Amino acid sequence: MLKLRLKRCGRKQRAVYRIVAIDVRSRREGRDLRKVGFYDPIKNQTCLNVPAILYFLEKGAQPTRTVSDILRKAEFFKEKERTLS
């Protein structure tokens, strides 16, 4: 089973996160299948690869609660409805 979850990057006291598609059994810093986005909580910046996220969601990937909150803030689900219509 796949998950869309955050992978910590950056340095001490300056965390930046990549949104990755990863196997459930892998640890947080484990090998990811694909990087599908980027999130900087300090600058409050988000960069999403929408086609890649849609691909993994169609394959059955489940986003974690934090990733789904990030996607909701970026109005990803509204875009998804537009692309499906």
From Swiss-Prot:
Signal peptide extent: none
Keywords, ordered alphabetically: Chloroplast, Plastid, Ribonucleoprotein, Ribosomal protein
NCBIfam families listed in its UniProt record: S16 (TIGR00002)
Gene: rps16
GO cellular component, one term: plastid
Top-level lineage group: Eukaryota
GO molecular function: structural constituent of ribosome
Protein name: Small ribosomal subunit protein bS16c
Subcellular location(s) of the protein: Plastid, Chloroplast
Record flagged with keyword Cytoplasm: no
Example GO BP: translation
Family: Belongs to the bacterial ribosomal protein bS16 family.
Pfam families from the UniProt entry: Ribosomal_S16
Chief site of localization: plastid
